């Protein structure tokens, strides 16, 4: 139960971007999510936090992001997707701290060759290490939803915009 609570809180605070000009996420049907794992030169994911771990955390049948949205939507919203990465960004974690929106942009750009963003309704970017909201260290990233960002991709000019 604790894992589910942290999963929900953590994933809802992560950077969620909707493709193209979406005004809001759908509340019914199926939403496809590209789930990007990014780490830093000085701060890699723990060895047991691999793609399988995040697949289960995001899309597993219990104590997951999928499970949360299934419950709160009364089985009206199905969240599916793929976990990509981890990708190592250029620079240390502190380079992206203090509310720096470049983390999301750099994560999308480094993953762009592996992801056709036209196949997804939303993008979630997850960082390694603690977030400032829990550590209190301003050099850590504050896990947040960026309200205004636009990122061009290599997918025929496709734009990720929120």
What role is predicted for each listed range?
Residues 25-162:
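Active-site-proximal segment of zinc-dependent metalloprotease catalytic domains
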Residues 6-7, 27:
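Hydrophobic H-region at the start of alpha-helical membrane spans
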Residues 1-5:
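Positively charged n-region of N-terminal signal peptides that target proteins for export
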